[in-house]
Amino acid sequence: MTNCRLWLVSLLLAGLTAACGQNAKTEATATSGSQAAAGPAARAAGDTSGLGKKPGWWKETVVYQLYPRSFQDSNGDGIGDLKGITSRLDYLKSLGIGTVWLNPIYGSPNDDNGYDISDYRAIMTDFGTMADFDELLQGMHARGIKLVMDLVVNHSSDEHAWFKSARASRTSPYRDYYYWWPAEKGTPPARYSTFDVKKNAWQYDAPTKSYYLHYFSKKQPDLNWNNPKLRQEVYNIMRFWADKGIDGFRMDAFQFVAKDPTFPPMPGLTESNYTNAYNHGPHLHDYLQEMNREVLSHYRLMTVAEGAGRNPQEAMLFVDPARHELNMTYHFDAVGVGDKRQGGYKLSELKNVFGKWEQEFATKGWQSIYLGSHDQPRIVSRFGDDRPAFRAPSAKLLTTFLLSMHGTPYCYYGDELGMTNINFTSMADYRDVAARNGYQLVKDQKGDTATYLKFLAHFSRDNSRTPFQWSSAPNAGFTTGTPWLKVNPNYLTVNEAVETKDSNSVLNHFRRAIAMRQQHKVLVYGQYELLDKANPHIWAYTRTQGADKALVVLNFSATPQRWPLPTGLAVAGEPWLNNYPTFAAGPTLGLQPWQALVLPLK
């Protein structure tokens, strides 16, 4: 969500256009109960999952991001659900992944695909019940798979019991759980929101003649982290899920939670700079250190700082072990590579982005390695080549890259098959609220809607949210009903059933890549060194840990390339991984289009 999501919406809109009180009381009662359940005895072992997690386990895992709405439908309503995921756990186990990151499944009116939460201790009805969740978690742990959940606490839904009470009266005990500006003080200080048609992050609320703050949509009022009672509510929610046995949290939009409640002027806010202005507010790290003391230090959880910091140095503050905050960062720099050039980017840009972050994180802290997510286009369409001749080799190359870099790899559902952008041509096919609102704005401003549609075909978030392609059965085996979002028509040839039977498929290459990383720890912990930096087609680097050394050579082009081995490097044997059937060792490597090699070195 957050930075990459904000980036996309800004790009779409700017680049192409000229009973409440009682409910709240019930919530508070539930909070007190969960706090009692999460006492020291329940957390003494520091590991409630039963997996015997060692410290730092999250460095060696491979994370599979699973978008529940699009993975597997179990009841024919066209929406993926928890029972559907449970039915596919053996498939997830077969991949070799160690951790699933699940996008939000909490109670929600679903204004923003679950990132607007109305009940942090319930399951969204579209996805099932808490019993379904318990069965899913048990099934994952039985197969040695850990579960990480999104923690979305920069804001709640406006349908949360806290907000319903807060907006009903200025004297509500939940009033200070949110940010308010009384109308009698005049217009509130300017705050920018891409998600508002007027680009205003303040929404007037008539019942109490006040404005409330929403960095995201008006359906997502910002929570007031200056209030210690609100912070304790969040910590109790975290204990509730940790005591259930989940294995980690991805801290969604957390870089925005700290705000100066006096709202000093922020002159000159624009679409290009407002997210940086909101980052790293006062007391942000005080909150994280408090969270660590109160909750995280009592469990062996994987904690991920989404969008942490405006640069690698700032991000390090979140994950420096000496600071006792979070485990790893998840940056968005790669999202901006070639973002305004449809179908094009420069390899040098990717090298520079990953090199910059690697330099800062080489000896301390830890980072995530990823190229795709629910907020971005499919990686083979964005960074590879989705033409039929090159889809498979380029998808394999991108997998090789993710599994051979320094950091914890994140693989998005469907990328293991080489799923591609769907390239909708009609606005009626889109479900993404950002795309639909953007189209309406272009239309209202009499802009070029045809150009906007072409842009969406490349960059809409719906490209990465199409249903998983299980087989050549109707709707790709995803549902017996009408899918909530159209299935990519290439499912007849790009699907799990076909690829499992093909030893040279993208899917089986993905399995081999994970097995390679698990076998050779130099690919987890080894030092990264870039080679031939100026080469516009080849990305080559070594990974070194003591006497162990590996060479990774990636041809990011649709043409054959020749690459001479640098002086002092000698291949020690057969490739650990190769996305083509043959390899000829020698002083110069002959590389096929989109060929990817991982080679042991002497």
Please place each PLM-identified region on the residue numbering:
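C-terminal motif of bacterial Sec signal peptides marking the signal peptidase cleavage site
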Residues: T17-A19
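Acidic/aromatic-lined carbohydrate-recognition and catalytic surfaces
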Residues: G21-R239, D243, F256-N311, P321, ...
